């Protein structure tokens, strides 16, 4: 009923009378209230955080947590995104932030499409155009890296699952474990063991 009423209202709205392509309907989606989240810096002992993404829900979480939100021109959330721009923005943000969350959406979207070839391209692009670029610019710096997906999206299911995700953490003071590759199977024998979400952040920040 609300959607139909907005169509009626917008049809006679003065702004739309002068538009070639009028807005003729409003579709509210997932209404809710802002979550009462403890500020990131307060929860983690004064750590100043920034967030980079092309996804609005990720930005919303960052805003709710009191993190600085950084928007990168050309960031699309797909395989045509500005990989280099996001990598450079992350490096620049480290100049005045203790923690930077760089979110990449392309592989997730390819999984929902069920496109294996495109997903492999997305993963390879993230590896060569983001991770390698960030590491090259920060070579010699005292930086801790954490690599992980936010959730699994098996390409045969094309939807999110609750399967544990593989995590890799790298830094000067982190001991090397037996894992030689990054995968769900290999991670089961890794030195981190199984970490719940809140424990993961604590572990990463304990290393900083």
Spans of features found by a protein language model:
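Feature captures the catalytic ectodomains and active-site-proximal regions of enzymes
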Residues: 1-208
């Amino acid at each position: 009923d609300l959607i139909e009423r907005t169509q009626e209202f917008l049809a006679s709205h003065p702004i739309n009378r002068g538009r070639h392509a009028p807005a003729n309907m409003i579709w509210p989606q997932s209404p809710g209230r802002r979550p009462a989240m403890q500020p990131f810096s307060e929860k983690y002992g004064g750590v100043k955080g920034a967030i980079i993404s092309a996804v609005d829900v990720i930005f919303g979480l960052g805003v709710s947590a009191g993190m600085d939100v950084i928007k990168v021109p050309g960031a699309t959330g797909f395989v045509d995104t500005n990989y280099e721009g996001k990598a450079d923005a992350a490096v620049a943000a480290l100049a005045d932030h203790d923690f930077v969350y760089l979110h990449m959406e392309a592989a997730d979207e390819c999984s929902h499409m069920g496109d294996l070839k495109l997903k492999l391209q997305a993963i390879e692009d993230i590896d060569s155009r983001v991770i390698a670029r960030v590491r090259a610019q920060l070579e010699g710096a005292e930086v801790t890296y954490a690599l992980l997906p936010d959730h699994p999206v098996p390409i045969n299911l094309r939807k999110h699952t609750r399967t544990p995700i593989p995590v890799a953490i790298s830094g000067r003071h982190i001991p090397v474990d037996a894992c030689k590759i990054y995968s769900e199977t290999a991670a089961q024998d890794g030195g981190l063991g199984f970490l719940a979400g809140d424990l993961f952040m604590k572990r990463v920040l304990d290393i900083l």
